[in-house]
Swiss-Prot record:
GO terms for cellular component: cytoplasm. Its main location: cytoplasm. HAMAP family: HslO (MF_00117). This is 33 kDa chaperonin. Under oxidizing conditions two disulfide bonds are formed involving the reactive cysteines. Under reducing conditions zinc is bound to the reactive cysteines and the protein is inactive. GO terms for biological process: protein refolding. Disulfide bonds join C245-C247, C278-C281. Belongs to the HSP33 family. Keywords: Chaperone, Cytoplasm, Disulfide bond, Redox-active center, Zinc.
Length: 341
């Protein structure tokens, strides 16, 4: 389990969110069988999403989704996080890999390639606010800082790091976001800039000094004051960070309705049932022939649970209007239920 800290620095001129996510990223690596550089890419994005959730989400039931689409061999990635420290994510090509950079570091930018970052903020009402910005470097941290400035008008410094060892297991992972508050004094910004230039890198600091030590180095001379989270029920004064998926057997079984009855019967004949793998977390669900044959014509959004297709009392099927769900996901219905041209 990881952890998230919040606080202020520079006598309130800087808002700070920091996360230690080593266990979270390692679980993602194991679940998806990620290559070392894919681990770094997804790990940075997951950590960044946790930081943005603390900075941007206004109510507990909101969620933030990062979608990175690039031309590199990774093929893109998707990450979702909430304000409670829950995060999940996946990459399109988990075993994709590229050579190390000349300095010996993982080349996340080349693995991601050129492209765009899309950020969705999903509200409890079903509304979704979406912003898209071009990728600056594909290294994730710079791209998130660029997004915060371009789309949210929030000048920020974002540091993200994932270090792997041995066969690719995660040695340390974490991140820090420093938001400049309106009216921040010039001397505070100058000190922050000087501290950033003097940093040896986030991952060496996390490995040698831990999260608190990294914050001390980054905010030296700026008087970091940690926010007391105990009033919110976090008795350790930190928010636990966990890899947590919202999939379950019911949702997995519903996914089979996207196959025709003939295709589902073929699964039963050839495989003795059906198997569904969650793309978010890699969880495998296996279903018996009886469970597969029990399917009714009902389709829900895999992300928010909204009914896309369901039987009415007269035996006809009711379909959702439009091509986009209220959460922003593209509506995909089984071929046999789509209106014929």
């Amino acid at each position: 389990m990881g952890r998230i800290l919040r606080g202020l620095a520079g006598e309130g001129d800087l808002r700070v969110v920091a996360a230690e996510t080593t266990d979270v990223v390692e679980e993602a690596r194991l679940r998806h069988g990620l290559s070392p550089t894919a681990t770094a890419a997804l790990g940075r994005a997951m950590t960044g999403a946790l930081l943005l959730a603390q900075l941007l989400l206004k109510t507990p039931k909101e969620r933030i989704t990062l979608r990175v689409e690039g031309t590199g061999p990774l093929g893109g990635l998707v990450v979702e996080a909430d304000a409670f420290g829950h995060v999940r994510g996946y990459v399109k090509n988990p075993r994709a890999e590229v050579p190390l950079r000349e300095d010996g570091k993982l080349n996340v930018g080349e693995l991601v390639g050129a492209g765009a970052l899309r950020v969705d903020r999903s509200l409890p009402s079903g509304e979704v606010y979406t912003s898209t910005v071009p990728l600056v470097s594909g290294e994730i941290a710079e791209d998130l800082a660029h997004y915060l400035w371009q789309s949210e008008q929030i000048p920020s410094a974002v540091l993200l790091g994932v270090r792997v060892k041995g066969e690719g297991e995660v040695e340390v992972a974490g991140g820090v976001a420093v938001q400049v508050m309106p009216g921040a004094r010039e001397e505070v910004l100058d000190r922050l800039e000087a501290n950033l230039k003097d940093l040896p890198g986030l991952t060496p600091l996390l490995r040698e000094r831990g999260l608190e030590g990294a914050l001390e180095a980054l905010l030296a001379g700026l008087g970091f004051e940690r926010t007391d989270l105990r009033a919110l029920g976090y008795f350790q004064n930190e928010i636990p960070a966990r890899f947590r998926c919202r999939c379950n057997r019911e949702k997995a079984l519903e996914a089979l309705v996207f196959f025709t009855p003939e295709e589902r019967e073929d699964m039963i004949v050839k495989d003795g049932g059906a198997e569904v793998v969650c793309h978010w977390c890699g969880e495998v669900y296996r279903f018996s022939p009886e469970e597969v044959r029990s399917l009714v014509a009902e389709v829900r959004c895999p992300d928010c649970g909204t009914l896309w297709l369901y039987p009415k009392g007269d035996g006809t099927l009711a379909r959702i209007e439009g091509e986009t769900c209220r959460c922003g996901r593209k509506v995909e219905l089984p071929s046999e239920t789509r209106p014929q041209a």
